Amino acid sequence: MNITVLAVGTKMPRWVDEAVAEYAKRFGRDVAYVLKEIKPEKRGAGVNAAQGMAAEEKRILEAIPQGAFLVVLDERGKAPTSVELAEHLKTWQQNGEHVCFVIGGADGMTDRLKQQARMMMRLSSLTLPHGMVRVLLTEQLYRAASILHNHPYHRE
């Protein structure tokens, strides 16, 4: 199964990169996990939030793997339990889907991009730093995979 995470933002703290890499390597052979950073649009100097999100949208759309099942992370999305996320992962795997998760920039994502998504998901009702979202999403995807493999990582 292929999982791509597109994250607007670069230059994350080292602990973020290390944590994402740690969970990504735990997936094993049956999950190909890729994190792609999308360059954020600079704000100011005549570039407002809407213009910035539009520029980021273009970069995101260019980076989405062809035919991928698109999941955007958004505060208005559904918050699945770990077991529910595992069920989604199982379905995507059975359908041979390449799943692409999108983490928007500081101002979020355009409505047009959200409308293209086949699923809107949130990790929390709290506002989280972008680096933390990368780590939490990767950990939860690993947890979902471990649930499917009856690995003792997840406990009920």
UniProtKB/Swiss-Prot annotation:
Transmembrane segments: none annotated. It is an enzyme of class 2 (transferase). Pfam families: SPOUT_MTase. InterPro entries: Alpha/beta_knot_MTases (IPR029028), RlmH-like (IPR003742), tRNA_m1G_MTases_N (IPR029026). Its EC number is 2.1.1.177. Specifically methylates the pseudouridine at position 1915 (m3Psi1915) in 23S rRNA. This is Ribosomal RNA large subunit methyltransferase H.
